[in-house]
């Protein structure tokens, strides 16, 4: 019992950080601007009349924030607030982006300090030798080959921004900072109603990438905290009530509502969490929960997650967002691949002295294939081919130089071939390569008002072949178990995070 109470207190320590005064420091906004320039994804810092970052604009912003009635008017009159009103002429677009970016940097400071002052624990291993996207498959083959069921989870988003603010109250006790966060979120939505339009969320995500990532990571870490804790303490669960270690701010009130639906839930032993072979993988807003348990056990996990999101985060998630499949009879979509674990029969001939034996051995093999239909459909949408896969020219590129046309087609072809070359069947890759090569030739022929045959005879097919087979730096990833909100001691569990440094753009629409 003392162990669980100490665990709760451990995560409540070092919360009294007052970070609000840092918003009045100029260097914070310089950091925010440098982050926008050095980010792996281009972040456009816009301003009125296309003005660039200026320390003078930041000083004006800080001067206005010192005004006594500035934030009061901003909250009471969000449609006419002094920060975003164009009638003032103080570069309102610049302020509306640079201030949330600076705020995101400030609120990240308590989490960085917590990581610095935490006692040194056992070093968390990092698999630095796995530097290729193709390392996923031997990794999954080693971990998932002996599992029976797989749950594919689409992690839901909270439909009300107030939920995200309440989650941060556990970690940040600086009340002015939380009120300022409400002010930012209030600008993008009607505060008294639920956000049912994805346009509002998309707008917030596009203009405030760092702040959106911070809020999303805090939400995911909170839900994973309970998932990992239940997984880690599964050996002790039959002895204690889960109410002992499910303590959180506001959660005690929601336990009552949960008890109405499931009376006696916290008094009974939750034995169904016990599973010695369970793996959890999160990537791109999705998660995979693999288990060797029974179908009944996995359904228990599914409904636990659904009710947990409903009664703890106060929003309903549809059961269809969690797909439960048996590995032997189905395949699953993972990072642009269709993966499966089919059973195959291997005939082994064994001879002992003069006797000959034939032994049939059933084996499992982790198989990965390229989704040909989806990729051809995406190329068709990008106007490289027809819906049936017939190559066509791309007229909008005919105004470019020959080298730019070759470079664009070459990059797409190499990226596709490198990323999907981990497939066990290469026929689809060669078909995609043929489509892009012929589409490139037809685009160049259309530009020079010639036929493909005449153009290829003049240019030579060897040049295209050499160009498309040119080597390029392959995408990198590493398997790590660290994160900003990592669960202490989780490195001894089967919890894996795929830290993908760069990913193929053509994979995103397929997911």
UniProtKB/Swiss-Prot annotation:
Principal cellular location given in the protein's record: plastid
Report the GO terms under cellular component.
chloroplast
What HAMAP family does this protein's entry cite? MatK
Give the record's GO biological process terms.
mRNA processing; RNA splicing; tRNA processing
What job does this protein perform?
A: Usually encoded in the trnK tRNA gene intron. Probably assists in splicing its own and other chloroplast group II introns.
Q: Where in the cell is it found?
A: Plastid, Chloroplast
What are the record keywords, sorted? Chloroplast, mRNA processing, Plastid, RNA-binding, tRNA processing
- The protein in question is named Maturase K
Q: Which Pfam families match?
A: Intron_maturas2, MatK_N
User: Which family does the similarity line name?
Assistant: Belongs to the intron maturase 2 family. MatK subfamily.
Q: Which GO terms describe its molecular function?
A: RNA binding
